[in-house]
């Protein structure tokens, strides 16, 4: 029985070391894969489903008629972020120096642009 426990603990250590090596090689601290975030636009009440998939974000706009459009946001180094960005409006994400510029997609009521500074994990 004790031999089985030793094998399990050794396997656990090996898995943790492999994970640490993979994370350091790819500079990944937080890996977000296929995480769904459901938000509502504060201005018009449109329901948004933001899907994080590796280094891409898919923003699905959900209306009464179902999904109207799918916005594929350009590649950004999102896996290095500590937490997901807030999505108060319909935004596209673009990396600019040390800030994240959220360029708004046309909203029925208005178009909003916003600079959001985000603390990024140093990899």
From Swiss-Prot:
For membrane topology, the record states: Single-pass membrane protein
Q: Which domain of life is it from?
A: Eukaryota
The record's subcellular locations are: Membrane
Q: Which GO terms describe its cellular component?
A: membrane
State what protein this is by name. Putative uncharacterized protein YPR077C
Q: What is its main location?
A: membrane
Report the source organism.
Saccharomyces cerevisiae (strain ATCC 204508 / S288c) (Baker's yeast)
**Where is the chain membrane-spanning?**
14-34
Keyword entries, A-Z: Membrane, Transmembrane, Transmembrane helix
Its ancestry begins with:
Eukaryota, Fungi, Dikarya, Ascomycota, Saccharomycotina
Record's miscellaneous remark:
Almost completely overlaps YPR078C.
């Amino acid at each position: 029985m004790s031999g089985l426990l030793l094998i399990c603990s050794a396997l656990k250590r090996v898995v943790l070391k492999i994970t640490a090596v993979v994370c350091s090689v790819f500079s990944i601290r937080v890996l977000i894969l296929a995480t769904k975030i459901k938000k509502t636009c504060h201005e018009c009440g449109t329901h948004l489903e933001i899907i994080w998939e590796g280094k891409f974000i898919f923003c699905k706009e959900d209306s009464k008629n179902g999904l109207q459009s799918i916005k594929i946001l350009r590649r950004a180094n999102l896996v290095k972020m500590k937490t997901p960005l807030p999505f108060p409006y319909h935004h596209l994400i673009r990396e600019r120096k040390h800030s994240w510029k959220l360029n708004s997609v046309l909203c029925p009521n208005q178009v909003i642009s916003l600079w959001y500074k985000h603390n990024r994990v140093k990899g």
